[in-house]
Amino acid sequence: MPQHRAVSPRSRRHRARRRQSPARGLSRRARLGRTLLVLTAVLVLCGGAAAWYLYRELDSIGSSAALGADAPKSKDGSTNILLMGLDTRKDQNGEELPGDVLKKLHAGSSDIGGYNANTLILLHVPADGGKAKGFSIPRDDLVDIPGHGQDKIKKAYGLAKAAAETKLRGEGVTDGRKLEHEGREAGRQAQIRTVRDFLGVPIDHFAEISLSGFYRLADALDGVEVCLNHAVKDRYSGADFPAGKQELDGQQALAFVRQRHGLERGDLDRTRRQQAFLASALHQVNSVGTLTSPTRLLDLKNVAKDNVVLDEGWGVSSFVQQAKNLTGGKVEFTTLPVESFAKHNGEDVNIVDRDLVRRRVQEQTGQGAHSGRTGSAKHKADEKSDDSTPKVAGGGVPCVD
């Protein structure tokens, strides 16, 4: 990881053949939406005529009780979804990925990356059908992790997983799958709580996708078009792309979203790459016939089955009408502000103003203690810092560094 001095981030320029009744059709459309929203990682919800094709297949998608029945919920009809991209080189049972897969991922051995949540995006979908907002949380933000003190926000998952497994082993548990499954549940609980405490807003649902899942998603979509402002080449991630628009396969797409070396703002530029990829994937699902191809839909289902975990009981039927505009471009991504860079326990971290971050999220979602507050000089001054983290809009193929 690059070495950062304590400097301002501004200076680190980074989609039935048979007839259906309306009620039954809605149920099936909702189930299709449930699959697609996870696979695109920004909830691609749409009621396609091919919904019947996957109807009986969706129960195989992993589910989790980590959110908790008593967790705070949004009270205004809107929905907040935490999207977690897990940087592990292992499958859901803790087994190492095959060597040929690791080679394609250009991600090194299964010992690298641990269980870091290297991608964290809070997606806010308003109740009125307005523009959805995606808030990217830089993975190295120094925050309070319950039970573990201050550390990088991405580490909450792995720290809690390791602690849970140690406790289980002390109780005599030796079954590897049980250790993996219960450890991951503890990790999800900790990551959700850490993000919720940091942002000060409810988390209604979550979706987790693995590193290999991201790779397989891009392949299942038959490539995703992206756009770069400048040519890049990086031996660490495997990124080697010319400037301009280009279509990337799964291996290339993973390199595109993982590169940070050689980018002027390092991790912050990588975050914008992730946002641009998601915006492009949404646009592609809506525009190139993904939802009319049974073969492609089956491929997407298989990606979800092996690589995606959702919170249990996610009833999407009530959510379809809210989110139906996402694939039409009514979504915008922004990166939450970073004050400076420093060292913590020998590692590079982002220093953040939690009050500013909370205010930014709460005001833009209309939730929390700061919702509805306007007009202060302090708030107007805060808005200027948005210039250092330009927004990424949906509805096309955005160009990024």
Task: Tell where the protein language model's regions lie, with residue ranges.
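Non-catalytic, solvent-exposed segments at the cell envelope interface
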Residues: 2-401
